[in-house]
Amino acid sequence: MALWGGRFQQEADAKFKFFNDSLRFDYRLALQDIDGSIGWAKAITAVGILTEAECAKLVDALKTLRAEIEPNIAIILRDAAEDIHSWVESKLIEKVGDLGKKLHTGRSRNDQVALDMKMWCKVQVIVLQQCIRNLQHKLVATAEDNQQTIMPGYTHLQRAQPISFAHWCMAYYEMLERDYTRLTDAYQRMHTCPLGCGALAGSAYPIDRDQLAQDLHFEIATRNSLDSVSDRDHLLELLASASISMVHLSRFAEDLIFFNSGESAFLELSDRVTSGSSLMPQKKNPDACELIRGKSGRVFGALSGLLTTLKGLPLAYNKDMQEDKEGIFDAVETWQACLEMATLVLEDINVNVVRTSEAAQQGYSNATELADYLVAKGIPFREAHHIVGETVVYAIQQRKPLEALSVTEFKQFHSVIDQDVYAILSLPSCLAKRSAKGGVNPSRVKEAIEVAKQHLAS
């Protein structure tokens, strides 16, 4: 039975019922809906709507219902209820009879669903932050194992300056740390309880909403009933956090796809996270990484979709808001899966240290060091930059790396270049010179790893 049937003389069309019903996706809110109902039962008992005995009976029934479905809430999908609120109420009435019909006194599905979604989001934030931490741990461990692994760093997908694979790992650690703190910030703004605001104008009963908020583990009650039932900022923030993080994960995946390719051969991904071709028996495809990269689009789409849904809505609640759920459910599930898969990808990664070192020695990635060498000899940087550019052109024509040029050849471009130039052109020297905080100097990278380990352990 619908919760709103008294006003209507005809049954809803079956097509409309399917179009309108939301149980097939909002069943995920079952535990939150039950917990919110327990809190509401206590709140209306405090103002005399229920007796203590009635409250105890309702709470016991709700707890029993929770225990029945918690192992597998998908069993709810066998039911034909309109939404999760209708389902919980109908099951409660089955257990306690007409007493169950009293529970909704003073409550609207508008403040009820706003509560459910905030409670659900809070749970997801905790899960997602743990997934981020797991990936960070794996990145730090991989970095620690590869502090001596020198590889080319890229700009414009061209070899630019040598870095270490450890430094690359720590770059993504930092991105994920920002993802983690974005969730922490969003979580704080989820800590306001909308229950007790009714449909839009507040409750007709003297509900102690501050106590209700505490009972439901919120910091405070919301301050404006109209805003409370209309607000979906917490969903937008969670989707925005997911989208930014998926950008990071997509770039991480793209780097690994490139590093794994035959053209780079910097590393090999495990058989556990790759697949083959139905036609070409030699293929080993980086499907895990490609799917992470591809799934970013559906998360971005969920954010774009909800922004578009909300942008023209008048206050307060409109049925359009039902469209907030499928996108957020899918986006959060996708984000979590991608975080877990990225962690798995790193577990058995095999870095080819010989190949990465060879690649770092190619492409004149030590040219900047030669420019800095000239600056140290008193040449203005802009002039030094030009001199090195001409030197690189010559080296390319001679098919030699810079370090293979003779002193005589170097002196064609400036007389200050001498035998001491060779020491600064070596790969270890290139890394050692970048000793400012955040640079690729091995001691700085080790320091960053230690700081990260301490942070993750705290």
From Swiss-Prot:
Keyword Lyase: yes
Keyword line: Amino-acid biosynthesis, Arginine biosynthesis, Cytoplasm, Lyase
Name of the encoding gene: argH
GO molecular function, one term: argininosuccinate lyase activity
Principal subcellular localisation of the protein: cytoplasm
EC number: 4.3.2.1
Pathway: Amino-acid biosynthesis; L-arginine biosynthesis; L-arginine from L-ornithine and carbamoyl phosphate: step 3/3
Protein family (similarity comment): Belongs to the lyase 1 family. Argininosuccinate lyase subfamily.
Range of residues in the leader sequence: none
InterPro entries: Arg_succ_lyase_C (IPR029419), Argininosuccinate_lyase (IPR009049), Fumarase/histidase_N (IPR024083), Fumarate_lyase_CS (IPR020557), Fumarate_lyase_fam (IPR000362), Fumarate_lyase_N (IPR022761), L-Aspartase-like (IPR008948)
Top-rank taxon, per record: Bacteria
UniProt keyword annotation of Transmembrane helix present: no
Swiss-Prot/TrEMBL GO biological process terms: arginine biosynthetic process via ornithine; L-arginine biosynthetic process
Record localization: Cytoplasm
Protein name: Argininosuccinate lyase
Source organism per UniProt: Haemophilus ducreyi (strain 35000HP / ATCC 700724)
Enzyme superclass (EC): lyase
